[in-house]
């Protein structure tokens, strides 16, 4: 019986260098799995973002444990049963019923655990909660709507905003029929549930601010809904990025939400509405002057 020769010195060093390089690559890549730009930060601005973050980390930690067990066992077997000079060729084993049952049942149990955990978190990720006591008041509800996927059990008004993606910016239209809208920056009150209707005008875009929840595609002719609720006391700027390649200006299509107190939101809404009305009146006057000028020339 022929025996397999051990790798020569240079070949052995090459194999060890390759293994060391692979291990180094894994160590270098590991921190990126926790990088803030890729996943919602722990303790984010909204409850659904925090639940997404928890579910992601549970799945990640289970995956890391499986990886370490499998790769550790593989490395142990490579060292423990490595070929030795003068040793006979190892016996060829075809199948091991206990081992095969073990890793099949083990994998099934892991899937069951992940499924159960997912369904525990999923309702709190999908269904918007009621607005809090410090949110938008009933007398400020001209922007609000209770027509939403899962109406709140109690609490204040729900703020509904249409998010319309366009190359290469976002337009935000507030419910209420008073033509309140903004570009680039969405302004919302804290402690108020905000339901978003995400769509697009031209191509597919994807609205994503990690601290406020998962990404949602904006598809022309179709509306996808999501929600977030910035807790009271967490006023500030929340930023994100269009997460769907949508053209040459995709990198500049950023999303921005400014969370303010309900009173500050009311003041901002009144000022913005007045500015829109003034701009409309100015445009109307300009059109009248242009039409009059064209009439005189005719």
What are these regions (language model features)?
Residues 33-58, 78-298:
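Non-transmembrane, membrane-proximal soluble domains of secreted or membrane proteins
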Residues 1-35:
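N-terminal secretory/membrane targeting signals
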Residues 56-81:
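Alpha-helical transmembrane segments
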């Amino acid at each position: 019986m022929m025996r397999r020769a051990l790798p020569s010195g240079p070949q052995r060093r090459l194999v060890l260098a390759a293994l060391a390089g692979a291990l180094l690559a894994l160590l270098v890549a590991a921190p990126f799995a926790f990088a803030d730009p890729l996943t919602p930060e722990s303790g984010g601005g909204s409850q659904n973002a925090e639940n997404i973050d928890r579910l992601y980390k549970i799945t990640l930690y289970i995956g890391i444990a499986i990886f370490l067990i499998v790769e550790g066992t593989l490395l142990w077997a490579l060292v423990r049963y490595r070929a030795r000079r003068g040793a006979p060729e190892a016996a060829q084993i075809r199948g091991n019923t206990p081992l095969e049952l073990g890793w099949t049942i083990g994998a099934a149990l892991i899937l069951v655990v992940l499924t159960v955990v997912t369904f525990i978190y999923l309702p709190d990720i999908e269904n918007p909660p009621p607005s809090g006591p410090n949110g938008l008041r009933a007398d400020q509800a001209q922007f609000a709507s209770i027509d939403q996927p899962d109406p709140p059990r109690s609490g204040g008004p729900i703020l509904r905003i249409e998010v319309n993606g366009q190359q290469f910016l976002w337009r935000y239209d507030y419910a209420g029929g008073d033509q309140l809208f903004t570009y680039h920056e969405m302004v919302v009150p804290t402690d108020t549930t905000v339901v978003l209707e995400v769509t697009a005008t031209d191509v597919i875009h994807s609205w994503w601010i990690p601290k406020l929840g998962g990404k949602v595609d904006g598809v022309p002719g179709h509306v996808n809904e999501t929600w977030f609720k910035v807790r009271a006391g967490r006023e500030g700027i929340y930023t994100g990025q269009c997460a769907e390649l949508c053209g040459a200006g995709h990198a500049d299509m950023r999303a921005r939400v400014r969370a303010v107190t309900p009173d500050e939101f009311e003041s901002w809404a009144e000022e913005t509405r007045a500015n829109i009305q003034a701009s409309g009146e100015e445009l109307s006057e300009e059109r009248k002057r242009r039409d009059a000028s064209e009439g005189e020339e005719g």
